[in-house]
């Protein structure tokens, strides 16, 4: 009976919107089932703003009717796993996933499902291809470029076949093409670091003259993609690359030092100069600064990076986060007392972390979202 009511509600939502145009309807439905749920809810987001918490029923199903939809990229999070979907007016989407194999098991049905199934299949294909591309990065530049361009062309041709077979919106076309192009452009930005290494990257000789031609089409202020991970996965190594020339000019170093304060402050300067969209710029500044503070052992360098960040960021929440991180890291220097942090032990008792230890102790941490965090952090730092 619950299944019947759920699908009946989806149908009513869909039919209720049929008489309106896509631009004026502004409604959508999303529901589905989570197999082996980690907890009893998922959170639905519009950009980075939470829309609502959707609770699972006794059969691990959920349903949600969006009365006023802002068409675009949305996302949901369950148990630390994160996925992006496209929601547009009149969409009535059901999803099913198994947390034991999150992305690989995710499938959509209903109106609006084809575009989202295409995107999850593309994501899984590109993700599996990463290992191949890493090996291809050992090839000399011309051969590497030939392979990468061939893979990119293959994906674009597949997208074109999809668009011929199914009606698609301008939003889907933009997001799908961006997923392809930015993914392969990311590999090109990472290539010099992988192929030349820190000892030879200063010269970077042998790159074909057309190697960076795609840079002419970069939109540093794409509001539609401002919360889309392939876009950021590209921008981080892109600015890493752009900062190299200034770094070598100013330091005269012969060997690349990724933790150099000169190099990292150059990155902040470039982000501040080239990106005008505040949301995008603030995110780039935040994560670049976070990574530097987390891996640098010099108080003077951390002070300089922190001051540079504060002079550029316009996001108060980000600024508060970076300030907290900065102060915490300074307290973690050898000889200082452990920061005042409350933790929960295995008995579900809350205690101060400093009160737990009375002898030399090794402390380690992990995250439910370690897969995605590790991947993003690695790309940011390469």
Task: Give, region by region, the residue ranges found by the protein language model.
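A non-transmembrane, solvent-exposed segment enriched in polar/low-complexity residues
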Residues: 18-172, 190, 195, 199
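N-terminal "domain-start" segment that seeds a small globular fold
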Residues: 318-354
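Positively charged n-region of N-terminal signal peptides that target proteins for export
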Residues: 1-4
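Short active-site neighborhood of thiol/selenol oxidoreductases, capturing the structured segment around
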Residues: 349-377
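N-terminal, charged low-complexity regulatory/assembly segments
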Residues: 138-262
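Alpha-helical repeat scaffolds
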Residues: 196-216, 262-271, 300-310, 339-341
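Positively charged, low-complexity/disordered segments
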Residues: 380-382
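C-terminal motif of bacterial Sec signal peptides marking the signal peptidase cleavage site
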Residues: 13-16
